């Protein structure tokens, strides 16, 4: 029955193939040349020339595949191929010899014949119907020999030899018999590698694994056939099917490249072998993760994710497998492909898992891989685009790693956004994950941005920029600032023009120079101002500056920005003159001064061409002068001399602000100096905060000559005016600490030194360098710093102790270790703290010379060192008396000077203990200090006449209250200044003439005597004229007359201990004291009888109030329970 059906199928197939030739389906293409002659075996088919070879081959293949696919056994399929080959042989007679379509069809038929012959042995070749089929095949091959198809000839030879399995070399290989590799390779080269692949597939399909492995190994050992990846895939398949061969599986895995492995995995998955592909993928992936190799890692992880989900669709299992593979990874970069597949495959929870993976990766040691760390920060910012706080932290972290201008721009853009509160409802991750991530992110920051505003963040970020980025940033910032200033100038000029035009129209006046009436007056001035402001853009003759360090030229003020590129740690050099500085601010001011000098030269030249005022006159008009006697100013002569000398040395025009920083020369007459000292008055300028000797001592020699070259910009003024200090509980301005002249210049407090300075910083450098042993200098420095070291926050009570301690903070490593025989010092305090932990037993040695005591506790060491200096305090009290005597010599009365100086010596020579000084520093000042406020006008107007002085002081004396002569509390008990106490027990006004003080002498805070020219009759005043408000007190010290504000007594909790403020506990007295109480006390102790309402329980003091309450009948029972009424 099956044979009849196959015969019928063969007849129908022949008819369809003949119909293809007779009725062409495709367009006429390349026609075959021929006359339609038929060949052997072509009795069933007719010839024709109406169809092209390409169309015929295409239709032929479709029909043959259709009929062959209807059978699942090899013999009927061989019959279909026999009929197809005979029909093709007849039709191909008209086709050309070198037609590629014919070659393709013949090769396909030959390979199909070979694949079906694998199912038959040698014995079956001589039986019907296989014998007839093979004979027809050989006959057709003889007619098709002109095409020279290799595969067809190979199949014909194999049929003659008895079949595909009958070759003796192949039999030896399959049976694992020893054979020479050369003979095996020669046999393998004699056939098409595709035939060996078909043999291996047949053996694997029949589960003949040993024979298949033997054949596959022989093919792999062949140099040419081994390039075919199928044999490697087949070997892995065989090893996968035999678990005993695990060692061979791993060995061959190591020999296979990952790229080839990916192709093998994909081919295995196409064949439906998912488990084999998954095991192969994991076998290739895990060694890559363990070795940290990123070669083909993205492809392997992606293929693994697809195979894992195909084998097990569970999302939780998938995530667990991802974590398991991540634990085996040694390269942190593998988190990126894993996060990619997790985010794609696990929908909602995938984002949170990815954020957690990033947080875990940041906890690893990534110091050697900043690029990967930046990628992690950028990934977190990509995952959480709506969390502004995390975005800012990530942007700052990226900037700290890259130090690029683009990273800074991102930080600036994020911090310019308005702050947003974190909303847990709209967050992409859970609150737990976010708050675990925040401290991890902040670990990479140099500071916590929550405690800094954007101004501080910008300042520190710009300082961290690299050289090229810093120059680019400064260039862009300067261009933006110039554009903004130019725009504001144009707007202001436009407003001025509009105002001028309105004024001209309202008054009816016209501009004679404006003929057209369109252009207003201010337009010409606007052009001049814009030209002066932006000379670098308009004028082509812009001066060029050459950098001395790199020999590059820059236009105009670009040299200032270029200087940022040459900054080094602890050293800043001027790129124009080469001068070195240790402070960046001083270097920048010095460099800007160079540029402004040249700019002023150009402006002065332009103004001179326009016949306006010359540059020298403009500088003299705008500069501040030094006030001399009776208010006359001789600063012009001094400025002209200074300008001439400076122009000869530097060949540059000195700016107008230089005169403010010029010191008074030593050659000034003594009377002029005394007048400056006596008439000096404070103003509102404030200077830089005091720097210790260790920071400023090295730079003083090179910066002292440049004191007149630094400009005083608004930023410095705003920064300086915010510095205030507290002395004895009151806010004190620096002018109250330092003596100043009428122009606000600060005088050196040293004994016999007459130099004055414009800024406190310069004064401090001069005083600490030139007069390091002067007592007044030490006390002034002590007072300015409030006795506290700004590095270690240690409090000192002795000025010499304070100065000696500051000398130990040597720049740049200012934080030193106190341990015995340890000379380590550090720049930052946390470095010192880490170093201190390295000492197992901390023992600090006393820093006093010739003292070698060791202490384990710092408080004990501090107390011990203070005892050394307290013992030296009485010996050093003679120098202030000399200073006071030098101060008083300016008075005209020599007798009074002698008396006051002798009294002062007695007062200061009294030693005062340190504890007493601290206690008395909180006490209020005496009424003598109330004179400060009224004498303020005297000191501010230093050039007033003596008559005005007499009248001012007389007014002060008239308002001084009378004090009872027998009252000890009204005396000036103690005046504490700079930690020293001056005790004065003499009352201000007394009825006893022997106890009256000299009214021509007024004691000030520092113990000096203030001479007075008030007549004697104004000294005593009635008690009724006591002032209602405290007055100011004038202070005449060794370096001038100073006014101090009245002392305002602070609240008791600020200076008293709690035991003096809290209410004492009540004590029980003896019974005899209780019985001794008077009858009057017993009367007050009697209790008053009170009346209460029975219902609402309201209490009343008398019966009338209770009756009025009851008469209203509005009260209700407080506890109204029915059960109580019934029981009653």
UniProtKB/Swiss-Prot annotation:
SUPFAM superfamilies: beta-beta-alpha zinc fingers (SSF57667). Its main location: nucleus. This is Zinc finger protein 654. A zinc finger (C2H2-type) spans 572-594, 746-771, 787-809, 815-839, 844-868. May be involved in transcriptional regulation. It comes from Homo sapiens. One of its GO terms (biological process) is regulation of transcription by RNA polymerase II. The modification Phosphoserine is found at residues 1123, 1127. It comes from the Eukaryota. GO terms for molecular function: DNA binding; DNA-binding transcription factor activity; DNA-binding transcription factor activity, RNA polymerase II-specific; zinc ion binding. Belongs to the krueppel C2H2-type zinc-finger protein family. Residues 903-915, 937-951 have a biased composition (Polar residues). SMART domains: ZnF_C2H2 (SM00355). Residues 498-523, 891-951 are annotated as: Disordered. Keywords: DNA-binding, Metal-binding, Nucleus, Phosphoprotein, Repeat, Transcription, Transcription regulation, Zinc, Zinc-finger. GO terms for cellular component: nucleus. It is found in: Nucleus.
């Amino acid at each position: 029955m099956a044979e009849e059906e196959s015969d019928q199928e063969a007849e129908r197939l022949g008819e369809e193939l003949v119909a293809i030739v007779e009725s062409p389906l495709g367009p006429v293409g390349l026609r075959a040349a021929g006359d339609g002659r038929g060949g052997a075996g072509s009795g069933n088919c007719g010839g024709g020339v109406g169809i092209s070879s390409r169309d015929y081959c295409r239709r032929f293949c479709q029909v043959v595949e259709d009929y062959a696919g209807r059978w699942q056994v090899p013999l009927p399929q061989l019959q279909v191929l026999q009929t197809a080959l005979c029909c093709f042989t007849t039709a191909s007679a008209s086709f050309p010899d070198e037609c590629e379509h014919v070659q393709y069809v013949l090769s396909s038929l030959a390979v199909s014949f070979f694949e079906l012959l694998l199912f038959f042995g040698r014995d079956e070749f001589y039986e019907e119907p296989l014998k007839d089929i093979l004979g027809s095949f050989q006959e057709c091959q003889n007619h098709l020999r002109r095409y020279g198809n290799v595969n067809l000839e190979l199949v014909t030879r194999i049929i003659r030899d008895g079949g595909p399995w009958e070759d003796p070399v192949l039999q030896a290989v399959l049976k694992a018999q020893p054979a020479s590799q050369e003979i095996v390779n020669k046999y393998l080269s004699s056939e098409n590698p595709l035939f060996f692949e078909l043999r291996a597939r047949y053996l694997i399909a029949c589960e003949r694994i040993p024979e298949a492995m033997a054949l596959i190994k022989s093919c792999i050992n062949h140099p040419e056939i081994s390039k075919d990846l199928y044999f490697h895939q087949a070997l892995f398949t065989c090893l996968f099917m035999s678990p005993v061969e695990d060692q061979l599986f791993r060995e061959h895995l190591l020999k296979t490249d990952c790229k080839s492995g990916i192709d093998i995995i994909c081919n295995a998955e196409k064949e439906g072998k998912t488990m084999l592909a998954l095991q192969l993928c994991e076998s290739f992936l895990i060694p890559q993760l363990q070795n940290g190799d990123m070669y083909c890692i993205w492809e392997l992880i992606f293929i693994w994710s697809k195979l894992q989900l195909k084998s097990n669709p569970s999302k939780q299992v998938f995530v667990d497998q991802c974590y398991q593979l991540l634990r085996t990874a040694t390269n942190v970069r593998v988190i990126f492909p894993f996060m990619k597949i997790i985010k794609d495959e696990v929908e909602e929870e995938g984002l949170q898992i990815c954020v957690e993976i990033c947080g875990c990766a940041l906890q690893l040691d990534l110091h050697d891989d900043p690029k990967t760390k930046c990628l992690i920060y950028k990934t977190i910012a990509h995952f959480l685009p709506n969390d502004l706080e995390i975005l800012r932290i990530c942007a700052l972290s990226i900037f700290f790693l890259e130090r690029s201008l683009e990273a800074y721009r991102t930080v600036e853009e994020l911090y310019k956004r308005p702050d947003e509160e974190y909303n847990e409802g709209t967050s992409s991750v859970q609150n737990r994950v976010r708050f675990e991530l925040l401290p991890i992110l902040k670990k990479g920051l140099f500071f916590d941005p929550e405690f800094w505003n954007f101004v501080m963040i910008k300042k520190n970020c710009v300082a961290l920029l690299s050289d090229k980025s810093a120059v680019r940033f400064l260039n862009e910032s300067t261009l933006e600032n110039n554009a903004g200033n130019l725009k504001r100038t144009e707007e202001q000029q436009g407003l001025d023009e509009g105002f001028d035009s309105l004024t001209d129209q309202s008054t009816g006046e016209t501009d004679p120079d404006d003929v057209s009436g369109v252009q207003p007056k201010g337009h010409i001035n606007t052009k001049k101002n814009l030209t002066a402001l932006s000379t670098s853009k308009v004028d082509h003759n812009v001066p060029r500056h050459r950098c001395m360090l790199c020999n590059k030229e820059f236009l105009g003020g670009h040299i200032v920005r270029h200087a940022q590129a040459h900054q080094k740690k602890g050293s800043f050099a001027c790129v124009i003159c080469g001068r070195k500085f240790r402070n960046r601010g001083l270097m920048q001011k010095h460099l800007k001064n160079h540029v402004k000098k040249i700019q002023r030269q150009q402006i002065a030249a332009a103004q001179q061409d326009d016949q306006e005022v010359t540059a020298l006159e403009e500088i003299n008009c705008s500069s501040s002068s030094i006030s001399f006697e009776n208010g006359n100013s001789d600063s012009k002569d001094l400025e002209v001399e200074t300008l001439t000398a400076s122009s000869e040395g530097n060949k540059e025009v000195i700016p107008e602000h230089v005169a403010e920083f010029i010191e008074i020369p030593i050659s000034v007459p003594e009377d002029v100096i005394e007048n400056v000292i006596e008439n000096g008055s404070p103003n509102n300028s404030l200077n830089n905060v005091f720097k210790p000797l260790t920071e400023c001592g090295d730079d003083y020699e090179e910066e002292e000559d440049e004191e007149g070259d630094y400009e005083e910009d608004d930023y410095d003024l705003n920064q300086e005016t915010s510095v205030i200090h507290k002395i004895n509980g009151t806010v004190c301005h620096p002018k109250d600490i330092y003596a100043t002249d009428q122009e606000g210049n600060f005088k050196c407090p040293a004994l016999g030194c007459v130099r004055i300075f414009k800024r406190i910083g310069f004064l401090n450098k001069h005083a600490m360098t030139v007069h390091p042993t002067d007592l007044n200098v030490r006390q002034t420095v002590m007072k300015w710093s409030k006795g506290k070291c700004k590095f270690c926050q240690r409090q000192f009570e002795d000025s010499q102790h304070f100065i000696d301690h500051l000398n130990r903070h040597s720049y740049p490593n200012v934080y030193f270790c106190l341990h015995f025989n340890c000379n380590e010092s550090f720049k930052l305090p946390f470095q010192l703290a880490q170093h201190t932990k390295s000492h197992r037993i901390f023992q600090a040695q006393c820093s006093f010379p010739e003292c070698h005591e060791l202490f384990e506790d710092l408080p004990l060491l501090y107390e011990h060192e203070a005892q050394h200096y307290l013992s030296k305090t009485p010996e050093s009290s003679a120098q202030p008396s000399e200073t006071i005597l030098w101060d008083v010599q300016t008075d005209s009365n020599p007798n009074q000077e002698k008396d006051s100086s002798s009294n002062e010596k007695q007062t200061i020579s009294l030693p005062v203990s340190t504890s007493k000084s601290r206690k008395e520093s909180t006490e209020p000042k005496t009424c003598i200090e109330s004179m400060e406020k009224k004498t303020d006008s005297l000191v501010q107007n230093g050039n007033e006449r003596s008559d005005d002085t007499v009248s001012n002081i007389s007014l002060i004396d008239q308002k001084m209250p009378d004090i009872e002569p027998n009252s000890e509390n009204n005396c000036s008990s103690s005046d504490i200044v700079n930690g020293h106490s001056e005790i004065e027990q003499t009352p201000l006004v007394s009825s006893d003439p022997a106890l009256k003080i000299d009214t021509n002498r007024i004691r000030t805070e520092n113990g000096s005597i203030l001479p007075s020219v008030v007549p004697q009759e104004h000294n005593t005043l009635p008690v009724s004229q006591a002032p209602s408000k405290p007055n100011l007190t004038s202070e005449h010290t060794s370096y001038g007359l100073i006014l101090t504000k009245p002392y305002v007594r602070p609240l008791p909790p600020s200076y008293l201990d709690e035991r003096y403020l809290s209410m004492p506990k009540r004590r029980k007295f003896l019974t005899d004291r209780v019985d001794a109480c008077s009858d009057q006390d017993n009367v007050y102790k009697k209790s008053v009888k009170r009346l209460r309402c029975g219902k609402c329980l309201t209490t009343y003091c008398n019966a009338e109030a209770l009756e009025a309450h009851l008469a209203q009948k509005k009260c209700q029972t407080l506890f109204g329970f029915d059960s109580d009424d019934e029981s009653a």
